[in-house]
Amino acid sequence: MPSTNASRKGQEKPREIVDAAEDYAKERYGISSMIQSQEKPDRVLVRVKDLTVQKADDVVWVRARVHTSRAKGKQCFLVLRQQQFNVQALVAVGDHASKQMVKFAANINKESIIDVEGVVRKVNQKIGSCTQQDVELHVQKIYVISLAEPRLPLQLDDAIRPEVEGEEDGRATVNQDTRLDNRVIDLRTSTSQAIFRLQSGICHLFRETLINKGFVEIQTPKIISAASEGGANVFTVSYFKNNAYLAQSPQLYKQMCICADFEKVFCIGPVFRAEDSNTHRHLTEFVGLDIEMAFNYHYHEVVEEIADTLVQIFKGLQERFQTEIQTVSKQFPCEPFKFLEPTLRLEYCEALAMLREAGVEMDDEEDLSTPNEKLLGRLVKEKYDTDFYVLDKYPLAVRPFYTMPDPRNPKQSNSYDMFMRGEEILSGAQRIHDPQLLTERALHHGIDLEKIKAYIDSFRFGAPPHAGGGIGLERVTMLFLGLHNVRQTSMFPRDPKRLTP
């Protein structure tokens, strides 16, 4: 007589056979073999953002990440995410899905990439948790393309939760270091996707606007033989048997291009600053949007051109990127960015008067501190209702050696900064284009003339009057969106304490 265990084993085998036989959907789900470009099937993958009521009752294929999953009886709800868009998907026991298929779907790890075939169905009640609120996907086939590990270093729902909301109800939020240590996952959040799509828009609008204005895009060297501005805040690199430096600015080369008769130039590229500044707005590497332009009679021709370029960028962002702006504001609420046309321009002495009236003690030739910049921004907003303005005629003593002195007041200079929400985003000036005056100013600043010989020599053969400035891309993004740390708007930030990832 067989043992009880043997009897049980004998009973289990036919049950397994029955279960396998009942899994009529076994060909409709599973883990796909690795895609190694073995074939190119004639299959169109529909974008999640295009799943609307216009596609109701269509059978579509979608590739997306599993954002969340929730099993309930004989059905499983998935939220499928593709960049900043998501849609609800339903796997339910029926003609196309077996209970084994539902179980398989429910157990797919979050962040896995899957291919799904399903029917787009209009829903009676809006799905508030998804961007595609009017439809859901009724799944007929589901295949895992890339399986994520079960333990994630951070949860995306926590990463997009407003900090205030987390503090109020005790739910988790994700701190900055955790985000940056796991940047690839953090960049998947809808907020990060929106930030960097808008930042891409800034570059596009900058380039588009300037090309329409007759500017020429140039590329300048980042490995140079001497510190860009004769200063010490440079990174030194080994260059064969000599030392070289990473460029602090493309300015000297922009000016050389003006001397070479290009008249109007701009460039977009990395800028390196070896400054041990651990603040909310400083990076050791950032993207510079740089402009240089010859003018006819007055450097204000250039100031107006740069200010108008920034205004065109602001208008373009508000017209073309409302979805991204609203996505970011859900997590980081902020007042809409305001600006005037034409741009408000104040002289430095006017700013000093406003600050002194507010109780700040400052000398006439003293530079603005960060707190005073922010205070001035609030005062300007109260008085003029603008977040963007130009501050003109800085004291000569606080500007670099190549800055043109004001001919009427030797203590002032033909220089300017531009501000967004009380923080500087551009520093610029009319450059000295006379080699003799340039030499005098360099010596006044204690700069070794031999190290800037090539720069000074470029003005010896006729140089037009010109001016320009450099804009920090990450700062513009941060301040336009009302964010509080430039690391949020740098894809892989570099600061004195971070060199990875």
Curated annotation (Swiss-Prot):
Record region (Aspartate): 251-254
Enzyme Commission code: 6.1.1.12
GO cellular component: aminoacyl-tRNA synthetase multienzyme complex; cytoplasm; cytosol; synapse
Residue positions, PTM Phosphoserine: 249
Keywords annotated in UniProt: Acetylation, Aminoacyl-tRNA synthetase, ATP-binding, Cytoplasm, Ligase, Nucleotide-binding, Phosphoprotein, Protein biosynthesis
Binding site for L-aspartate: 229, 273, 427, 431
Catalytic activity: tRNA(Asp) + L-aspartate + ATP = L-aspartyl-tRNA(Asp) + AMP + diphosphate
Superkingdom of origin organism: Eukaryota
Compartments in which it is found: Cytoplasm
Keyword Phosphoprotein on entry: yes
One Gene Ontology MF term: ATP binding
Phosphothreonine modifications at: 52
Residues that, per the record, bind ATP: 273-275, 281-283, 424, 472-475
Gene Ontology process terms (BP): aspartyl-tRNA aminoacylation
InterPro entries, per database record: Aa-tRNA-synt_II, aa-tRNA-synth_II, aa-tRNA-synth_II/BPL/LPL, Asp-tRNA_synthase_2, Asp/Asn-tRNA-synth_IIb, NA-bd_OB-fold, NA-bd_OB_tRNA
Subunit (UniProt): Homodimer. Part of a multisubunit complex that groups tRNA ligases for Arg (RARS1), Asp (DARS1), Gln (QARS1), Ile (IARS1), Leu (LARS1), Lys (KARS1), Met (MARS1) the bifunctional ligase for Glu and Pro (EPRS1) and the auxiliary subunits AIMP1/p43, AIMP2/p38 and EEF1E1/p18.
Similarity-based family: Belongs to the class-II aminoacyl-tRNA synthetase family. Type 2 subfamily.
Entry function: Catalyzes the specific attachment of an amino acid to its cognate tRNA in a 2 step reaction: the amino acid (AA) is first activated by ATP to form AA-AMP and then transferred to the acceptor end of the tRNA.
Protein name: Aspartate--tRNA ligase, cytoplasmic
